Amino acid sequence: MRYMILGLLALAAVCSAAKKVEFKEPACNVTFKSEANECTTLIKCTTEHEKLIIRHKDKIGKYAVYAIWQPGDTNDYNVTVFQGENRKTFMYKFPFYEMCDITMYMSKQYKLWPPQKCLENTGTFCSTALLITALALVCTLLYLKYKSRRSFIDEKKMP
């Protein structure tokens, strides 16, 4: 009788352990961009589980969240992973302030692309390219013209 009770307890323990779901931590990627003098962030996450939800500031999204970061905003975001009826929340901290500071500094430092005055920059580029092409064409034609004359004169001089 004692072995029968131990067997039932062991079977119950195995069954309860089989129901437990193991959650793998989602892989998240945070990118930054400077748009209209604001630092925008994009958080993308992938997982092997059925579904996930990302929460950052007041934004909620499935697999991705796009938000505008401003000084004073929180550095936290969380990802909730679902598997059947079970779920688990992973908490993350990210240095948004430092990354946005670098992103904004670099965008102000190097105003090379995209052009701010598109028409002027494009017109200048096209004019310069046309001038260089014309100069190269004139030089090539002059070289060919005088080279053929020299070779013709050299042929006449030969006995």
From Swiss-Prot:
Post-translational modification: Both disulfide bonds are absolutely critical for the interaction with MHC antigens.
GO molecular function: D-mannose binding
Keyword Transmembrane helix recorded: yes
Positions in the Lumenal compartment: 18-123
One Pfam family this sequence matches: Adeno_GP19K
Keywords: Disulfide bond, Early protein, Glycoprotein, Host endoplasmic reticulum, Host membrane, Host-virus interaction, Inhibition of host adaptive immune response by virus, Inhibition of host tapasin by virus, Lectin, Mannose-binding, Membrane, Signal, Transmembrane, Transmembrane helix, Viral immunoevasion
Topology within the bilayer: Single-pass type I membrane protein
Residue ranges crossing the lipid bilayer per the database entry: 124-144
Disulfide links within the chain: C28-C45, C39-C100
Residues bearing attached sugar chains per UniProt: N29, N78
Gene Ontology annotations for the cellular component aspect, listed alphabetically: host cell endoplasmic reticulum membrane; membrane
Intracellular or extracellular location(s): Host endoplasmic reticulum membrane
Locus of motif Di-lysine motif: 156-159
Ranges facing Cytoplasmic side: 145-159
Family: Belongs to the adenoviridae E19 family.
Known role: Binds and retains class I heavy chains in the endoplasmic reticulum during the early period of virus infection, thereby impairing their transport to the cell surface. Also delays the expression of class I alleles that it cannot affect by direct retention. Binds transporters associated with antigen processing (TAP) and acts as a tapasin inhibitor, preventing class I/TAP association. In consequence, infected cells are masked for immune recognition by cytotoxic T-lymphocytes.
Notes concerning its domains: The lumenal domain binds directly to the peptide-binding domain of class I molecules. The di-lysine motif confers endoplasmic reticulum localization for type I membrane proteins.
Protein name: Early E3 18.5 kDa glycoprotein
Source organism per UniProt: Human adenovirus C serotype 6 (HAdV-6)
Upper classification of the organism: Viruses, Varidnaviria, Bamfordvirae, Preplasmiviricota, Tectiliviricetes
